[in-house]
């Protein structure tokens, strides 16, 4: 049900909002979201979004390149991965009351993925600030990966020297791979990934490796 998030997300208070960036860095910093909006080099990018459930769309995001934030904290050489964490407010987001699920939502990238030019932190969509249901006030956009990797409402970014445990990979690892690159050759256990349905037109199209961004990211996996 895609209507539920629109309703329930409105309970989330997104001001004040800070993003704590630390771990294996020389300059751990807590950033206020409004300071980031004033100081980071914002740009608009139209990027494809491919859900693991085989629907897709193109989205005009506003935000900045992830590595521009990471440069400010100076990652240490031993950092191999980036762990991202969303808010934990179970009485606001009542799904988080499910004690058998590994809340808060966590995702992770390799440091090479996070430093790639295509990895993006979005603060806006369609020319407006992110709505709460889309991950306000700041979310990850990694368009060569399935949508569940694009963590929303980020509060913490930690550079680590291990592969972090992530929400869906922990919950159902056979269905949700940690790397989760879009790949038509690898089916989901319950459906193929060879095709995708465009959510705006209903058109059925072939799935492209890396969601069409192979020229920019395939070298990360060679």
Where are each of the predicted segments found?
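Structured, non-membrane catalytic/scaffold regions adjacent to prosthetic-group chemistry
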Residues: 1-222
């Amino acid at each position: 049900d895609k209507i539920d998030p629109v309703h329930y997300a409105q309970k989330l208070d997104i001001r004040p909002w800070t993003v704590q960036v630390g771990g294996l860095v020389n300059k751990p910093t807590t950033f206020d979201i409004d300071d980031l909006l004033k100081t980071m080099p914002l740009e608009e990018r139209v990027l494809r979004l491919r859900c693991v459930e085989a629907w897709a769309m193109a989205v005009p995001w506003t935000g900045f390149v992830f590595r521009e934030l990471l440069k400010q904290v100076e990652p240490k050489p031993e950092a191999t991965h980036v762990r991202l964490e969303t808010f934990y407010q179970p009485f606001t987001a009542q799904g988080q009351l499910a004690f058998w699920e590994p809340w808060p939502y966590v995702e992770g990238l390799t440091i090479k993925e996070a430093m790639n030019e295509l990895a993006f932190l979005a603060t806006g969509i369609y020319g407006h600030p992110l709505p709460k249901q889309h991950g306000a006030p700041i979310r990850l956009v990694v368009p060569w990966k399935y949508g569940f990797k694009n963590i929303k409402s980020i509060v913490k970014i930690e550079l680590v020297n291990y592969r972090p445990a992530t929400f869906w990979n922990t919950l159902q690892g056979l269905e949700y791979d940690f790397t989760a690159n879009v790949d038509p050759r690898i089916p989901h256990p319950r459906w193929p990934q060879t095709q995708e349905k465009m959510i705006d037109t209903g058109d059925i199209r072939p799935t492209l490796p890396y969601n069409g961004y192979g020229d920019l990211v395939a070298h990360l996996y060679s």
